């Protein structure tokens, strides 16, 4: 069997192999930093049921049975897109936050407890319930002040507006 590990590629990209599969670990991997959390989902798919069983067994040995998901290509692509929002975009927000703090000679460490608590909240409740902040409260005065502070950064200002409006629409 030949399997790929992509969250976005269709299983058909390896259809020239009669026994094809997908073994997609849903985790953020970095060349610089080794993986800290060994608990993560593995999504599997195969063209044959015996190969699917083999992929499930391998995944279960690595992460446990409860973290193995049988997903078709459409479902896997949806998971990957959601993961980009949840992981890649949130990390980019951390980068922006760090830049904003550095302007005032502040260290990113001041935000780490907030980041951890936010992540812990979404373990206990759904993200909509966990949402806080001026956009959620409809605090126009604070949002206007933030917009003034972001005047030197049109991209950050546009991003702030876009995300705030998205939060307001989903209140």
List the model feature ranges, each with a label.
Residues 31-34, 76, 136, 140:
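Short capping/connector residues at structural and topological boundaries
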Residues 9, 21-24, 66, 126, ...:
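Residue-level signal for pocket-adjacent positions within structured domains
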Residues 19, 34-123, 166:
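Internal alpha-helical scaffold of NAD(P)-dependent oxidoreductase catalytic cores
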Residues 4, 45, 136:
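Active-site-adjacent beta-strand anchor residues
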Residues 11-17, 100-102, 150, 167, ...:
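Alpha-helix C-terminal capping segments
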Residues 109-171:
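NAD(P)-dependent Rossmann-like dehydrogenase/reductase catalytic/cofactor-binding core
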Residues 1-35, 55:
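Rossmann-like NAD(P)(H) cofactor-binding subdomain of soluble oxidoreductases
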